[in-house]
Amino acid sequence: MQLTLTLSRASGMQLFLLVSSLLLWEKVASKPTAIVSTDDLYHCLVEQSHNTFIMAADVYREFDINFAKRSWMKDRILPLCHTASIHTPENLEEVHEMKTEDFLNSIINVSVSWKEPLKHLVVCSDCSSGASVSMGKKAVDMKDKNLIILEGLQTLYNRTQAKVEENFENFDYPAWSGLKDLDSSDEEHHLFAICNLCRCVKRDIHKIDTYLKVLRCRVVFKNECGVSTF
């Protein structure tokens, strides 16, 4: 018996975009980022950042469902994220005024600020009672993808500079000081710290995703695209 698979036009386009994305990522992943074209690097970083944001949103949603509705959690005031001091554009006027290299610098500062916290989020996801296996896996994937994004961002940034930066020592990123609360033996302090971490990583990865799309529009498409997030 012959089976015929019929795809709607919309489904066929989604499949085409998915396959194209995978092929592009395989093409880039098979090369050192230093020899990947700027256009391809932007396309792949946007794909990576968008997927990472989806995972961050899923992790935050799961935490919210499992933990955040506890009565004591509702009475607490959420503190500022540790990246709040990093200057990033907040409206279209600031976006247009910011130079590409300064834009990349800001995004790198946000991304590198999450290297250490994401390591600890992975540990907490594995050891927290009530956290699913899926939540732990997504935390690991977020940590790994952030490093991939960071490597690509550094490559793009270096292409705007006369002097190549080999590491992040010259970037002005804020230190994270939330480990004490995260390691607290008090369950309320511990869970509240995880809640804040999940909330902030979702917020910041959304920023990275949005800003990469803005820069891709500027650099790759010469501003001939619609980015209306601001």
Curated annotation (Swiss-Prot):
Taxonomic superkingdom: Eukaryota
Disulfide bond sites: 81-200, 217-225
Asked whether the keyword Glycoprotein is assigned, the reply is yes
Question: GO molecular function, one example?
Answer: hormone activity
Extract the InterPro entries matched here: 4_helix_cytokine-like_core (IPR009079), Somatotropin/Prolactin (IPR001400), Somatotropin_CS (IPR018116)
Where does this chain mainly localize? secreted
**Residues spanning the signal sequence:** 1-29
Location of this chain's protein in the cell: Secreted
* Glycosylated sites: 109, 158
| Keyword hit for Signal | yes
Cite the entry's keywords alphabetically.
Disulfide bond, Glycoprotein, Hormone, Secreted, Signal
Q: Name one GO cellular component term.
A: extracellular region
- Pfam families from the xrefs? Hormone_1 (PF00103)
Q: Which family does it belong to?
A: Belongs to the somatotropin/prolactin family.
Output this protein's name: Prolactin-3D1
Species name = Rattus norvegicus (Rat)
Per UniProt, what is the name of the gene that codes for the protein in this document?
Prl3d1
